[in-house]
Design a protein with these regions (language model features):
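The feature captures the transmembrane alpha-helix scaffold of multi-pass secondary transporters
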Residues: 54-57, 107-115, 127, 177, ...
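Structural signature of the two symmetry-related core transmembrane helices
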Residues: 85-100, 108, 150, 318-333
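Glycine-rich segments within core transmembrane alpha-helices of 12-TM secondary carriers
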Residues: 64-67, 121-126, 130-190, 292-295, ...
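Flexible cytoplasmic loops linking transmembrane helices in multi-pass membrane transporters
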Residues: 2-54, 215-284
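C-terminal transmembrane bundle
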Residues: 114, 149, 267-270, 278-389
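Membrane-helix boundary and inter-helical linker elements of multi-pass secondary transporters
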Residues: 79-80, 102-105, 134-138, 164-168, ...
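Hydrophobic core of transmembrane alpha-helices in multi-pass small-molecule transporters
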Residues: 38-39, 44-48, 108-122, 179-181, ...
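Helix-breaking motifs and short loop linkers at transmembrane-helix boundaries and internal kinks
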Residues: 82, 103-108, 120, 166-167, ...
């Protein structure tokens, strides 16, 4: 890899005595790359050096923009066409753009595919979260919404392990994305969300899925449980609005207005802290792989902490407490930056900050799902997730 200093070279001779500059800009061919950590990288292959070094950050921004757009459109697709169809579209975008990205001849094509990967990648979590919550009853909504975070952290750890053993970026790209193709098999293994089918009036399909699940669990259901009049009497059939809910509906009436503003700030602040600590984690120690592993591993205790305490202490107290802990830890870690004698303390404080940020990240998903009514819930999660990016 090359740093900014390697983009200059010494001038061999100075004919003009007035010239004080002793270096001149060099070309890509003049650079010597350090292969002690990686054998190849996109920085070298796509020439993200010197006056083109900004492209590396730009394509990172494109990925985040894709995630933001994906939050919005995938939520709409999920509500209109079904959870599983939205999930399969996400699988197609991530696997297709990820695999093709390893063979792109130029950096602009690669950047566009990273954008598509961001769109599809966000569908994985959002749609899967909704499916997990809708597959269980109210008693297990919180537990289901929190447990799903743990495989997310484990996936990050696996990616770090792959990167440690695979130092060629093309091979790593393929190893990380080819297994995603296996997720197409979920179409045949996981049925559509019965709650979504009920909400869209497809009662026969919902009944078939629920009865199959009851049979597997040795449960018996009443014969008329999915009759329209029974559902209406028992208030089990979700009300369907005449018009599709929009972003503006999040601010009607007054109670929803303040609730939405509050949650928008929660999502924004939590996400900024979470991703900021994640991106900065590679600079904690000299070994970037160990840094990444520590940053990912600390998320798991954060999620487990939420599982054990939220049922007893509620959402708002835990969210407030963890935000204070995370914020103070980050401020303290920043004040200790550059002090070699306190480097270990800075790392510990950074990890405590990531612990709190990860836990907050999980809580805001569950909290939003519980705060907003059914007809506007998916719109709220999708739009807040879009705004946070």
């Amino acid at each position: 890899m090359a740093n900014e200093e390697t983009c200059d070279k010494y001038i061999e001779a100075l004919d003009d005595p007035k010239v004080s500059k002793i270096v001149s800009n060099c070309t890509f061919e003049d650079l010597i790359f350090d292969h002690s950590i990686v054998t190849s990288s996109i920085i070298q292959d796509y020439d993200f050096t010197c006056d083109r070094s900004y492209l590396r950050q730009l394509y990172g921004v494109l990925y985040m923009v894709g995630m933001g757009i994906g939050s919005y459109i995938m939520g709409a697709i999920s509500d209109k066409f079904g959870r599983m169809k939205a999930l399969m579209l996400g699988v197609l975008l991530v696997s297709g753009s990820g695999i093709l990205g390893a063979f792109m001849p130029d950096q602009h094509s690669y950047g566009f595919l990273r954008f598509l990967t961001g769109i599809g990648g966000n569908a994985f979590f959002m749609v899967t979260f909704v499916i997990c919550v809708e597959y269980v009853g109210p008693k297990y909504t919180m537990l289901s919404g929190l447990i799903i975070e743990i495989p997310f952290a484990l996936g990050e750890l696996v990616l770090g392990l792959e990167a440690y053993f695979i130092r060629d970026w093309v091979t790593l790209q393929l190893v990380a994305h080819i297994p995603v193709l296996l997720l197409f098999g979920l179409w045949f293994l996981i049925p559509e969300s019965p709650r979504w089918l009920l909400a869209t009036g497809r009662l026969d399909e919902a009944e078939k899925i629920v009865r199959k699940g009851a049979k597997i669990n040795n449960k018996e259901l009443p014969e008329d449980i999915f009759k329209t009049d029974t559902l209406e009497n028992e208030s089990l059939l979700p009300s369907i609005p005449e018009e599709n809910p929009t972003f503006l509906d999040l601010f009607k009436p007054k109670l929803m207005f303040f609730r939405s503003l509050n949650m928008m700030y929660q999502w924004f602040s939590v996400t900024m802290c979470y991703y900021g600590l994640t991106f900065a984690s590679v600079d904690l120690l000299e070994d970037p792989y160990l840094n990444f592993a520590l940053s990912c591993f600390i998320e798991i205790p954060g999620y487990l902490f939420c599982i054990f305490v939220m049922a007893c202490w509620g959402r708002k107290p835990i969210l407030s407490f963890l935000q204070v802990v995370s914020g103070l830890s980050c401020i303290a870690a920043g004040l200790l930056y550059g002090i070699k004698s306190l480097e270990i303390l800075q790392i510990i404080l950074s990890l405590i900050g990531k612990f709190g940020a990860s836990a907050c990240f999980a809580i805001v998903y569950v909290y939003t799902a519980e705060l907003f009514p059914t007809v506007i819930r998916n719109t709220a999660i999708g739009n807040f997730d879009y705004l946070k990016k």
